[in-house]
A protein has these predicted regions:
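Conserved core of the sugar-phosphate nucleotidyltransferase
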Residues: 116-209, 237
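Short phosphate-binding loop-to-helix
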Residues: 70-105
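Short aromatic-hydrophobic micro-motifs that form the base-stacking/packing surface
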Residues: 106-110
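Residue-level signal for inorganic ion chemistry
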Residues: 11, 37, 93, 111, ...
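N-terminal glycine-rich phosphate-binding loop and ensuing alpha1 helix
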Residues: 2-62, 75
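Acidic helix N-cap motif at the loop->helix transition within catalytic regions
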Residues: 62-68
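Generic C-terminal helix-cap and adjacent flexible tail
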Residues: 2-5, 99-103, 230-237
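Hydrophobic helical membrane-anchoring modules
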Residues: 215-237
Length: 237
């Protein structure tokens, strides 16, 4: 009988978050008593099905050593050096797992600045994709009216929101498939902005799995306030 697949996670954390307008990378900002990345890693490491979490760090990251000694779940954490773009960091994270992961194992790639991920959403993603040959991602249906503009900022079209989703993370795919898809994209100098795009480019069809709307990514200063509220509310559930 074939062994069941293992689950691994990769967290690209080499970015600097320019839109936040702060002096330090956004993953090291304080949120609900800990740094953003500590909150994020805590969500992943606490899940019993995730074997280990690889954190892809910037080559000149001087802040990680200041929080690393006090991180929970030390036995689950691995680190590697990230790259110039998210796709480079994720690929390096996958390489770190080469001696651990089997081809059919699952890898969950999750944003370092998405600290409100709920345990139930990880459960839902794993359960929904358990028998899927490719994998998929968490997302939320678009609720707002969508507009397309020209380069001058003038509205040129209203885009139908039917079957339109906001892609979120984790994005979960088979280890070998994702590694090859990212390698092919990088070799073609295509800088995909998420893992699903690499899988789509390889000719596969990821599955969308609906998640909670509070699984936000911290991108702008006001997002910190919102994330603080969400984390406090989750503690009360």
């Amino acid at each position: 009988m074939k062994n069941p697949p293992n689950y691994w996670a990769v967290v690209p954390a080499a970015g600097v978050g320019k839109r936040m307008g702060v002096a330090i990378p956004k993953q090291y900002l304080q949120l609900h008593g800990r740094t953003v990345i500590e909150q994020t890693l805590g969500r992943l490491c606490a899940h019993p099905q995730i074997q280990a979490v690889v954190v892809a760090l910037g080559a000149d990251d001087e802040l990680w050593p200041t929080i690393q000694p006090t991180l929970l779940h030390q036995n689950k954490l691995l680190t590697t050096i990230g790259g110039a773009e998210r796709c480079h960091s994720v690929y390096n994270g996958l390489l770190k797992l080469e001696d651990r992961a089997s081809d059919d194992d699952w890898v969950l790639v999750h944003d370092a600045a998405r600290p409100c991920l709920h345990h139930n959403d990880i459960d839902r993603l794993i359960a929904t994709l358990a028998d899927h040959p490719v994998g998929g991602l968490l997302g939320v249906p678009v609720a707002d009216t969508m507009k397309r503009t020209n380069e001058q900022g003038e509205v040129i079209a209203t885009v139908s929101r039917d079957n339109l989703w906001r892609a979120m993370t984790p994005q979960m795919f088979r280890y070998s498939l994702l590694k090859q898809a990212l390698a092919d994209a990088l070799n073609a100098n295509v800088m995909v902005t998420d893992e699903a795009a690499a899988i789509e480019r390889a000719g596969h069809t990821p599955r969308m799995v609906e998640c909670r709307a509070d699984n936000i990514k911290i991108t702008r200063p006001e997002d910190l306030t919102l994330a603080e509220m969400y984390l406090a509310r989750q503690e009360e559930e």
